[in-house]
Amino acid sequence: MPDDALYVYGIVKLGFDLDWREAGIEGKNVYTISECGFSALVHDCEEKPYMSEDPNKIKELIIAHNKILDRAINHFDGVIPLHFNTIIKKGGNSSQYNLKKWLNNNKERLEKTWDKIKGRGEYGIRIYYDKEKLIEEVSNSEEIKDIETNREGKGAGLSYLLQSKAKTKINEIGWDKVNGFKKKFYDDIKKVTANLKITPSRIFIDEEKDLLVNLSVLADNQQINKIKGFLEQKIGNGFSFQLAGPFAPYSFVENETA
């Protein structure tokens, strides 16, 4: 089949056609098609999605898609990402005509989104706490010590009940502290950038058991350096962190480009 369709990676604010000469999915040449001040990053493709029964092949395709977006962040000072397998078909018109029509019809929404993400990328921040240290601190608190003291000299049944009460109280105090830590980190980072979201962890490994909070933030270089400096001050105080990015800001454009 001929390459009558256009595979679209994302949108940048360029305003003119450019033969970008970046290698996209399956080595396809990526170029831009422009309308109303915005340019779509595209390659020519068939009118069908990229499919494979091999999960590793699909993974490779998605990685290639995301690499184009990562390069676009640096080259065009930002990118409005579109999902893997976004394909514009020709229908009764050419695929290029349909794409330009879409850019024109969505100009106002694209302007709003671009103002939000220009010069910024999405970063993932995972903050961990020292669970053993926290349990030790809570266990040594006056409230828990009083319960333990009351166990002395008591019968086996009452002693067991008091021991269970102590464990329950340790968990309650511990979770209160964890939630307090989480709120404090969130509030402090929000002072740097209002664009942040708590996201569920998709990693299930032993090391994740002490995950305090998993955040996605939209930030420019100055903002992320400030956040990194703040987090580095917390190292050694029972906390550690991992910072990844910048990535295409999927978490912050979902509603704007729908």
Residue ranges and their predicted role:
Residues 1-258:
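An interfacial alpha-helical scaffold signature
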